[in-house]
Amino acid sequence: MQLPHILQLLVLITLANGTPIVAKKIFGPRFSFPMDAGTVFFDGRPLFGPSKTIRGILVSVLITTASAPLIGLDLTIGAIVAGAAMAGDLFSSFVKRRLNSPPSSQVLGLDQVPESLFPMLACRGALSLTIADIALGVGIFFIGALILSRFLFRAHLRDEPY
């Protein structure tokens, strides 16, 4: 079991997923360009929706990459974690649009699992993670994200308590 690596990844995954939320509060609507540029999929629904922005992805990648050495990981791992976490977030947003869920709505599991599973899988080889390590990391993130979201809502950093 690679517990130190799991914990390091959880820090980076939390950072990768949290920095776009903080950037939204700091910048408001400034620099908020939708990742899908308003593209509509063949089903008539947005590709990702307005809450997935280029600003959020750039801030996530920059901050997470720069933070990785502070917890003993390589810059490359930070970039991989951020990119994979954002890919997971975009994946869940895409699926939610296909399910006709409103933007920023909660779909339990779909909101937490891809955001943590994708980065864990992406770092599996570099950090010698086992399937058990990945399952544990995703499980911890799932529970932690539900708890942390409520605190962020109370601190007025999130618009919804999930």
Task: Tell me the role of every PLM-derived stretch.
Residues A126:
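Acidic, glycine-rich low-complexity repeat segments characteristic
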Residues M1-I80, M86-A122, I131-Y162:
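Interhelical loop and helix-boundary elements at the membrane-water interface
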